[in-house]
């Protein structure tokens, strides 16, 4: 604990203690040692096929651009966010890619410390540079959906003091911004080296619970559960994503 406190103080003279979870306006419901969310079966069996009907077709696998009809599974199944929001609280977040996080006491920055076990589907570790690249691409690339730029518009800059630490500096106090940043979808910096426009039909390299298998453009897409998913035993993931195959058609 002493080492952790010294580490936090090294970033800023106005820092708060690292947290496993945060709630907006209230303490998080779940304790630090929770095993799984109450609404899931932590020992649920794995297997089977889950087919989901989709209204309309799709013409792109890139979920971040404004143009095109998006395929349904890429963002929800193959990409992890910094944190995970529980479904039985107004607005609370718990660790996923970020194992802990904190809002500075002055309210002008938020820091996320990455889980050292996190890795992308290509085997690369999830590093601070990937988080920074994801944020910058989504908020600065002209082809990106403007939602991202608006949603995080009070972020002045992002810093990466080391491979596992990401600091977001704010333009002004914003009561919800640190929570909104937890919803950042993180993908490898190798995903779109030439920007989103040239990668308009390219899916990101993610770290999520499923991997893309195949698709019939506009009609069907299929995903397989990653049996080596790095986060499968985290409390925010235990008992979830149980089907071996998920199919949209």
What role is predicted for each listed range?
Residues 79-89, 181-245:
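Gly/Pro-rich hinge or "lid" segments in bacterial periplasmic/extracellular proteins
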Residues 19-21, 47-56, 99, 109-111, ...:
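Short, well-ordered beta-strand elements
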Residues 3-12:
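Sec-dependent N-terminal signal peptides
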Residues 14-18:
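Sec/Tat signal peptide C-region and signal peptidase I cleavage site
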Residues 19-106, 136, 205:
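N-terminal lobe/hinge region of extracytoplasmic solute-binding protein
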Residues 27, 39, 55-58, 66, ...:
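Solvent-exposed coil/turn segments that connect beta secondary-structure elements
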Residues 113, 149-193, 209-216:
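Surface-exposed binding/hinge segments that line
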């Amino acid at each position: 604990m002493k080492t952790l406190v010294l580490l936090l103080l090294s970033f800023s003279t106005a820092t708060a203690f690292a947290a496993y979870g945060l709630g907006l306006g209230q303490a998080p419901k779940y304790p630090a040692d929770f095993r799984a969310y109450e609404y899931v079966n932590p020992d649920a069996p794995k297997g089977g096929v889950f087919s989901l009907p989709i209204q309309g077709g799709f013409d792109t696998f890139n979920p971040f651009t404004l143009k095109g009809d998006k395929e349904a599974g890429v963002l929800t199944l193959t990409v992890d966010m910094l944190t995970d929001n529980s479904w039985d609280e107004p607005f609370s977040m718990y660790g996923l890619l970020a194992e802990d996080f904190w809002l500075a006491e002055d309210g002008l920055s938020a820091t996320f410390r990455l889980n050292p076990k996190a890795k992308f589907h290509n085997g690369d570790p999830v590093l601070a540079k990937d988080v920074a690249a994801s944020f910058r691409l989504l908020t600065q690339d002209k082809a990106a959906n403007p939602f991202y730029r608006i949603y995080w518009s009070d972020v002045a800059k992002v810093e990466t003091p080391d491979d596992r630490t990401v600091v977001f500096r704010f333009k002004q106090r914003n009561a919800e911004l640190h929570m909104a940043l937890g919803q950042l979808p993180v993908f490898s910096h190798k995903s779109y080296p030439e920007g989103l426009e040239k990668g308009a039909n390219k899916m990101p390299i993610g770290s999520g619970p499923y991997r893309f298998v195949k698709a019939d453009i506009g009609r069907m897409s299929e995903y397989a559960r990653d049996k080596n998913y790095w986060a499968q035993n985290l409390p925010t993931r235990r008992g979830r994503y149980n089907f071996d195959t998920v199919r949209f058609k």
